[in-house]
Amino acid sequence: MLETKWVAEQLGRPVVKAFNSISIGSLRNHGRPKGSPERIALPVAADDQQAKDVIIGLIDEIGFDGVDAGGLDASWRQQLGGALYCTDLSASRLKEVMQGLTDDDYAKLGERRDIALKAVMEWSHGLIAGDLPRLMRSLAGLPD
């Protein structure tokens, strides 16, 4: 069972997964006005469409594009090691990447997570603002 589904089950409440997919540096420094070409998109996964719509609106208000990423069963794509985790993609690029993900990508999630954790731990004292998105894009096989 995916962690997000487990959390929803434990809480007995709707869960919306969104803000785990952006680093604190990007959240703090990269909000942009609607329509800006540099605007970062956040994938938003939830089984409750109304709750998802509320969070997409909130994301827009703080300067990012919220993109419907399906239900919680699809939320693995935005977990550490997934192609949508902290990659700072535009809405159009995020949708493109999301559509191209397969069961093979899901199968590699654990391995990519372990590699990412190791790299972040090794860089913990020297990680600078743009490093995490570049590292995550590299692990996902996305161009920088």
What is the predicted role of each segment?
Residues 1, 5, 9, 29-50:
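Short beta-strand and adjoining strand-loop segment in the mid-core
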Residues 14-20, 67-69:
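General beta-strand structural signal in soluble alpha/beta enzymes
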Residues 12, 21, 60:
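Residue-level marker of positions within ordered structural domains that often coincide
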Residues 37-144:
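Active-site-lining helix/loop region of Rossmann-like oxidoreductase modules
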Residues 23-27:
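Rossmann-like dinucleotide/flavin-binding elements
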